């Protein structure tokens, strides 16, 4: 054991709680939306993609972590580590790129840079395809030999190898690629879109260019997406910051808990994403009831 056995028990209980809550609420989000035709809007396709990403994390990652925590180390070998690391990375990246698509959609709706443009089902499908391609371009390379997945922290789960410069894996180039293409760029796009959108909302409110009902509806949707983005940052920034510090300070002395805490803190989006959607979408709540 790298830590007191009680720590593994606490981790297993935490993962069980995430599974107990995360699976039903994400499955409910998918079921209710697919069951009610009026909920099958282009915007909701992207929100459904978030639910699918969360289910990948719950079924492919959380269950594995709970099982290994019961043994006190990662007992599933190289194949199990690759699968767990792949599903966790894929789910997180699908969620991030879905938020990018939502931010662009909100920017187009709010600022109307393209006159007479409507966000249609075809655009939503292209957005879904884009989020999956980008997520796979981050999650697949470690399986193909560009970097690798290894047990991290207290060895309860697997993640990207920020810790070593193992020969033959080109860890440095992949970590730089991952942080640039799959973290800094999407966050920059999100901040740009919402920064511009905030200015546009203020200008529209001052000029009263749209009806009060339309403004209220657009503000509610934008508020929901912004809260999802903030929640994503709160959960993932600590993990990204610690991972980057470890990568830049390899050889430094740090304990297993140092990486474990932000790693498992980052798993909470699987719960709060559907919660935000359910709590802030009146139409969905009415269909659910």
Swiss-Prot record:
Tell me the domain of life.
Eukaryota
PTM remark:
Phosphorylated on some or all of the serine and threonine residues present in the C-terminal region.
| Residues carrying sugar | 171
Q: Where are the transmembrane segments?
A: 8-32, 45-67, 82-104, 124-144, 174-195, 224-245, 258-279
* Cross-referenced InterPro entries: GPCR_opsins, GPCR_Rhodpsn, GPCR_Rhodpsn_7TM, Opsin, Retinal_BS, Rhodopsin
A GO-annotated cellular component: plasma membrane
Per its UniProt record, what Pfam families does this chain match?
7tm_1
Cysteine-cysteine disulfides: 81-158
Q: Which residues carry this modification: N6-(retinylidene)lysine?
A: 267
Residues under site feature: Plays an important role in the conformation switch to the active conformation:
84
Q: Name one GO biological process term.
A: G protein-coupled opsin signaling pathway
Protein task = Photoreceptor required for image-forming vision at low light intensity. While most salt water fish species use retinal as chromophore, most freshwater fish use 3-dehydroretinal, or a mixture of retinal and 3-dehydroretinal. Light-induced isomerization of 11-cis to all-trans retinal triggers a conformational change that activates signaling via G-proteins. Subsequent receptor phosphorylation mediates displacement of the bound G-protein alpha subunit by arrestin and terminates signaling.
Q: What is this protein called?
A: Rhodopsin
> What species is this protein from?
Limnocottus pallidus (Ray-finned fish)
Q: Which gene encodes it?
A: rho
């Amino acid at each position: 054991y790298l830590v007191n056995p009680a720590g593994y028990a606490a981790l297993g209980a935490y993962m069980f709680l995430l599974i107990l809550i995360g699976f039903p609420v994400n499955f409910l989000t998918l079921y209710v939306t697919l069951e009610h035709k009026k909920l099958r809007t282009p915007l909701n396709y992207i929100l459904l993609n978030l639910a699918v990403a969360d289910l990948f994390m719950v079924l492919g990652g959380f269950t594995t972590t709970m099982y290994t925590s019961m043994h006190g180390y990662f007992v599933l070998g190289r194949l199990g580590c690759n699968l767990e690391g792949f599903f966790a990375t894929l789910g997180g990246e699908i969620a991030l790129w879905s938020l990018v698509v939502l931010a662009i959609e909100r920017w187009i709706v709010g600022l109307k840079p393209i006159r007479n443009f409507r966000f249609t089902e075809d655009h939503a499908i292209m957005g879904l395809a884009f989020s999956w391609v980008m997520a796979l371009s981050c999650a697949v390379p470690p399986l193909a030999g560009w970097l690798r997945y290894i047990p991290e922290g207290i060895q309860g789960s697997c993640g990207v190898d920020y810790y070593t410069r193992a020969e033959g894996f080109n860890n440095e180039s992949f970590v730089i690629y991952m942080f640039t293409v799959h973290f800094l760029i999407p966050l920059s796009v999100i901040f740009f879109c919402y920064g511009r959108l905030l200015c546009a909302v203020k200008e529209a409110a001052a000029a009263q260019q749209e009806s009060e009902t339309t403004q209220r509806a657009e503000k509610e949707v934008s508020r929901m997406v912004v809260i999802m983005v903030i929640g994503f940052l709160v959960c993932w920034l600590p993990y990204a910051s610690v991972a980057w510090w470890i990568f830049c300070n390899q050889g430094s002395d740090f304990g297993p808990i140092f990486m474990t805490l932000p790693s498992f803190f980052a798993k909470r989006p699987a719960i709060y994403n559907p919660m935000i959607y359910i709590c802030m979408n009146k139409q969905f709540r009415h269909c659910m009831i």
